[in-house]
Amino acid sequence: MGARLRSAHDKSGPELMKTSLRVLAAAVGFFALGLQFYVIAAPLEGAELTKWVIEYFCFFTILTNCLAALAMALPVMAPRSALGRFFDRPSVRTAIASYIVIVAAVYHLILRKYWDPKGWALVADVLLHYATPAMFVLDWLVFVPKGQVPWRTVVTSLAFPLVYVAWTLVHGAQTNWYPYPFVDVATLGLEQVLMNVAGLLVVFLAVTAALTGAN
């Protein structure tokens, strides 16, 4: 009896830590997403507000943070649901980890100079580009089971970035608006944008391969 209790206690410690981290990360993630939407949307009305709703979901940062928040929340809130099981897969969490690492790196190294947020916008910026990535990577390092990420994840993880690029180029061609300067066809031309995209896809492959190998 005592041995069983000790075993249960040993298991409950790491499980409690995992649950606590995921609840905190999900709360921070959803708060940051809502705050980022609000600080831009607050003064807008009518067509401008509708336009912002569409543009909000055109940012890779926003979409990736949505995935990260869902991946933290659903395995805790609905662990037996199809989505809860999906987001708890080691391969899925590894793919999202690679996306969120690239979000943080690209923002810090390339995009930060284009954006100077103040006040609540700065809070949202720090949470989306630094806090959420750090918590998700910490969760991946500590709680994703080792040796369970197949190498095909390196290739399959490209599906989301490829769909995103396709949508960005199609939407941009219709609206002449692009969410990031390195995919701005109107300014750079299609050839340069495709070269930029190819370079980023190589980075995605490299980061996912590194994470898969580390697992």
Model-found features: residue ranges?
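Alpha-helical transmembrane segments of multi-pass membrane proteins
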Residues: 27-44
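Hydrophobic cores of alpha-helical transmembrane segments in multi-pass inner/ER membrane proteins
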Residues: 61-75, 131-141, 196-211
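Membrane-interface transmembrane-helix boundary segments in multi-pass integral membrane proteins
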Residues: 17-18, 58, 175-210
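Membrane-helix exit/interface motif
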Residues: 42, 71-81, 102-117, 138-145
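N-terminal membrane topogenic signal
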Residues: 10-26
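Non-cytosolic membrane-interface motifs at loop->transmembrane helix junctions
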Residues: 48-57, 88-89, 115-128, 151-155, ...
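Juxtamembrane non-transmembrane "cap" segments at the membrane-aqueous interface
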Residues: 159-178
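Interfacial segments of alpha-helical transmembrane regions
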Residues: 83-99, 150-158
